[in-house]
């Protein structure tokens, strides 16, 4: 069997299994999460190259489902967050981002798993964090907001989720400014109630 054939079969299985055992449809959610700052872009974190700093975040989050596919385990949500950072600097952050939620994993009968991706949002902080300043001390209060999240729940209790989130602020590779700073990245753990 060729590699392409195996890939097509895997994708078909990922789509078909969740359709056979579709869960409840939730339109709203509220939750909270906490995390610690790390000093690389999200790609660096996934490669094990992150170092953690003494900057922390506590946040409230809410989301609303805007669209749900009738044939795929896919939906679009609008996610908002309000957070407080402390440690190296104390500041408040507010952000909003459209998020794709993929719920089609073959093991969902054992552990319901959802992947949430929000690559293009808006984040604003009450001040520029010293961790976000470039070589010449410049930074931006308003940056892009990106999140990558894995959410887990019991198949019989999908309204209660725990999640792991990569919370990322950035200038989109200097598209928004050319100060040479990465922005901020937090590895966070949280809880969400869906209704």
Regions found by a protein language model. Give the residues of each.
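Generic alpha-helical scaffold signal
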Residues: 52-56, 70-72, 90-94
